[in-house]
Amino acid sequence: MSKARVIILLALASLLALPMGIATANHFEGTAAISDDKAASDSITFSLKGVHAPSAGTQLVGWLISDDDATKLSTGAMTVASGDTVSHTFGSSSTGYTGANLIQNFSSLVITEEPSGAVPAAPSGATVYHYDIPTAAIAQIRAVASAGGTGSAQDLKTQLAAAKSELTLARATTTLDIVRTHTHKAINIIEGPTGSNYNATHGVVEGIGVLGHAQAAIDAAALVGAASADAKAAADLVQITAKNAKTFAELARDRSVSLVLTETNLAQLDIHLANVIGVVENAISGLDANADGSIGAVDGEGAANLVYTNAQAMGTYKLKAGAPPPFIVPTAVPTATAVPTATPAPTPVVVPTATPAPPVVGASSVPLMAHMALLAALALLIGGGVVLLSERRRTQG
């Protein structure tokens, strides 16, 4: 092969390799998922890749931010491992841990570059990654995962456990009237006060019952899916598993009414109660319907336990490079006055500030290297052309 052809091939190879190198250097993906450690939703785990190394003398620090931007909780300094990855967990052993419910108390997350050493009390450096859970989504996520300290997902599990306890007491007795009393209590817990089989003489139940909590989770998750594309997959799983829990609970209720309350033979009652207790356990833990060795978030399998974990997943932060838009304090709506001559004060206009530029992801020398590679490739192409032309003239001469 002639020298000219070799030079031209090298130039083409340089041009083809250049875009791949740039794309690799700029790729970033990151999530921060909330889970239980010592308390409900008190821990968050970061999984990041394609992370740019912090500037000399600085470190990356995570911050959870409240809805009103007033409270900022440091999740600690992060170490960028080889391969530009970060794996970091904030939990009960971390500095600054209080056991607070992170879903209930926060809705935004930023990662900033801070001076190396002690983590400051509040973020002061440049924001390099961020995510804000949409306002319309966070309220419904909390309704399922954390409202009132528990949310409908935990309330569902609590009520199912109470129903199982009553049925277990019914099975433990040999007195027919006591069996029926405990069974009625279980039915009341499942149906709630508005149920067609509810009987207050056997025990008043506060709240909305198992079926009510399951439906509340279904309804809230549907609104989450409509409000946030990032949370839709988890919201769909909440709906599937809550529907499964509701179906199992309804079956337990129906069998309690049709089998337990109508039976007078104690031996047969024991069989029926064992069956109903098993169905309630399905409503809690789910059922391996296809016998594949696992209980998944699919129709007929996963139930209340998976409602809760998928509710937490709806609150996962899917980080983006750069800083978020500046926080704007909501303007209060003026209250109408009965005095006709009163002139409402004009609402102050918030002047938007420029959004900070996103961080440089990858090595800072990438743009310079790209220009140098382009110049080298052009030089090789021109040089190869000159050599090729010279060889042809020499051959023709």
Residue spans for each PLM region:
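Bacterial N-terminal signal peptides
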Residues: L9-P19
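Ser/Thr-rich, Proline-interspersed low-complexity disordered segments
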Residues: M20-A25, V329-A370
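Short, surface-exposed binding/anchoring microloops in extracellular/periplasmic proteins
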Residues: N26-L60, L64, T174
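Exposed aromatic-hydrophobic patches
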Residues: F46-K49, S82-A100
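Solvent-exposed serine/threonine-rich low-complexity stretches and specific carbohydrate-binding patches
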Residues: L73-G83
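Mature extracytoplasmic or organellar-lumen-exposed domains after removal of signal/transit peptides
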Residues: T98, I111, Y129-V333
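Short acidic/polar inter-strand loop motif in beta-rich domains
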Residues: S108, E113-S124
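C-terminal membrane-anchoring or membrane-association module
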Residues: A376-G397
